[in-house]
Amino acid sequence: MREHSMLRKWQAECVAQALKKYESGTNHFFCQATPGAGKSIMSATLAKTLLDKGMIDLILCFSPSVSVADGMRATFSTTINCPFNGCLGSIGQSLTYQSIQYLGDHFWRTIEKYRLLVVFDEIHHCSGDEPDRANIWGRQILARIQGVATYTLALSGTPWRSDKFPIVLAEYSDPEGKLVCDYQYGLAQAITDNVCRKPKLVLVDNEHLTISEGSGRKSFASILELLKQSKTSYQDVIHNVQAMEYIL
């Protein structure tokens, strides 16, 4: 069982801030922490704190994949020191977002009788601020979970979507439209704290680059060749959307 003194500084801060927000009467908390920082341990510790304070009865965790859901199950079971498999005597269950649609009405009627904490891992996979503007996972959350959860905790290491749709349950600033996070722990701070390593970025070249010059076209075997044998600059390459689609 993990005590608060064993938490990283950011984890302890986040637990304290989430608890304060919940106790103030607000039921949703959004934590953005860089991948690998320990979001699952933080959320499990918060869940245990809420249990110890008598603020919740049950916990549900949802994740985008079976492997992540299994990891959450193990972390919560160890931290809370209780089975976390959804069976008799368990304090909760860890499932995938895909499974929400297969949980029947009887399940939700039973769950709504209890004070429930729902943890959404990698919440950015779920979009929508209303059912008609949501993907299937976001729609299930809005329809099934939003109304029965006593508290919700959203976790994300990369809180943005390429389709620009809002993340489900998230709050955005007006008029800027920026995501409002209740707690943020970025990569720079994680590197400073020796929580994460400094990433190494590798640019993979493209072996067939073609540019148009007037009525003609020229091909190059690499970015280096393109830069040396044409008037194209490096900035031209990285700011060209079509070019970047073929470069990792």
What are these regions (language model features)?
Residues 18, 45-50:
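Hydrophobic residues on the short alpha-helix immediately C-terminal to a glycine-rich phosphate/catalytic loop
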Residues 164-248:
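Interdomain helical connector at the RecA1-RecA2 junction of SF1/SF2 helicase-like NTPases
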Residues 24-46:
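Walker A/P-loop
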Residues 1-32:
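Conserved pre-motif I regulatory segment
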